[in-house]
Amino acid sequence: MSTPLEPIEQFLNNPGITYGAHGNFGYVHDFAISPEAFLSFAENDLDSGQSHKDINALSNAKRAIECQMECILKAFTLFSSRITFPEKQVILTKIGLPASTMLNRFNKIRNDLEHRYLPPTPEQARESVELADMFIRSSRNYLDDFTSYFEMENSETGKKICFDINHDSTTISARIIDSSYDSLNDYMNKLPATNTPDSLIICQQPQAEYDRLLRLFGFHMLRIRRRTFSDKRKWHL
């Protein structure tokens, strides 16, 4: 049985597609305390001299990581107060962010404290703070320059696909249109309201198709970001 996403997936499976225009913006969270602030608390805890400094440092390192996770989830319109720490890690991994490898070690230390009530050693506390710092640094760029719109073109078919994420309506959309149009806005402005693209899907959380479309969006968004970062490095060499 075909699904609404099938034309989109078939388009993306074509080896002849190339990346085109994309739009970025700086995503700003609305939390009263930032991930960087929690990280600063954790660093101060390590040097506090208190008997429970390692526990405090680990706890604030966890808050720093989780706050950063939730900032990213909000950027992808996936935030929910009911999602647990491990579930957040799984979601970020599905999107394609490098969360698992970095956080698996942290989870072991965190679980020992939160579920076995074993205090961290000074070395474990310092490692946890360092892991939190690494995670925030490695993922910050995704928020400072978040890709919310991008296009991919197939020169053989003369078609392009336009991905767009809308935070106001909590939706992700994908449209296949003719490559003769400069952009999705150009397409929307020039066609009568009765016309539709070759394929259109708009998924809203928690619709079943949303997770699949989000994975496609995240995968190709990260590929665009890696290519852009590589181009910037070449430019500076």
Predicted regions and their residues:
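Charged alpha-helical initiation segments
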Residues: 1-54, 144-148, 161, 215, ...
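Short, solvent-exposed segments of well-ordered alpha helices
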Residues: 25-29, 48-59, 93, 97-100, ...
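Amphipathic, Lys/Arg-enriched alpha-helical patches that create a basic surface
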Residues: 27, 41, 72, 125-172
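Short, charged/polar, low-complexity loop and linker segments
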Residues: 41-48, 85-87, 114-115
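Short, hydrophobic, well-ordered secondary-structure elements
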Residues: 43, 53-74
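Short, charged amphipathic alpha-helical segments flanked by flexible coils
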Residues: 72-99
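Charge-enriched, short contiguous segments at helix-coil
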Residues: 98-149, 234-237
